Amino acid sequence: METLPYNDFGNWIRKKFPFRVQKISVDAGFTCPNRDGRLSVNGCTFCDNRTFSPSYCSRIKSIKEQIEEGKAFFARKYPEMKYLAYFQSFTNTYGSLEDLKRKYEEALAVDDVVGIVIGTRPDCVDEQKLDYIAKLNEECFVIVEYGIESANNETLRRINRGHTFECSKEAIKKTKERGIITGGHIIIGLPGEDQNESLRQAPIISESGLDILKIHQMQIIKGTKLAKEYTENPF
């Protein structure tokens, strides 16, 4: 088998558990500050949550129902599987602390769930929320994943993120200080960014302190603002 030049997530996660684990996506009913009017109402120009949400993942169902349906789907292949509840849709720390506690702990109470993965924005965590997540981290497996998207503030403005890269660095620092496994997402090929710009950002992202990095290719989804921009002015 060819040895990869990096530590891929599959090999890494297998070393964390004595059993096979699978993430189950959950839509816990959150929104985003650039959707609900606090920062904007338009959302990120590239985003359509429906494109990465499994069929069992629906906010009209309870968190427990979504996880149980996800378990039924994956158990057909691996009956002895354990699970990580993946709070994936929208911004999963954008709510009151009590709301977060209720939702996270509902997921953790489901049989065979051994941890949670929290997808969020770097401008939607504070000391109180991070302290609570750090406490959870003492009791179960926790990953916090930040949507960084780019280290270029002009790009972040152009795609209507509503935060800066400096905000991402600060959130990563505070999360890491609490001993929480910290991940980040970036997108290659955002408007205005070519190969040289991606290579310029690589050491900047690398030095941010992340434990996990997910690299996505740019996808232009029909119906998004970015699709309209691309139709009018291809990049």
What are these regions (language model features)?
Residues 70-74, 125-139, 170, 199-209:
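Short amphipathic alpha-helices and their capping/turn segments at secondary-structure boundaries
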Residues 35, 89-97, 189-196:
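Active-site mouth loops of central-metabolism enzymes
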Residues 74-78, 103-111, 131-141, 173-177:
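Acidic (Asp/Glu)-rich catalytic clusters
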Residues 166-225:
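Conserved C-terminal portion of the radical SAM core fold
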Residues 50-70, 74, 78-97, 112-125, ...:
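Core AdoMet radical
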Residues 1-84:
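N-terminal [4Fe-4S]-dependent radical SAM core
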Residues 225-235:
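Short acidic, glycine/proline-enriched helix-loop-strand junctions
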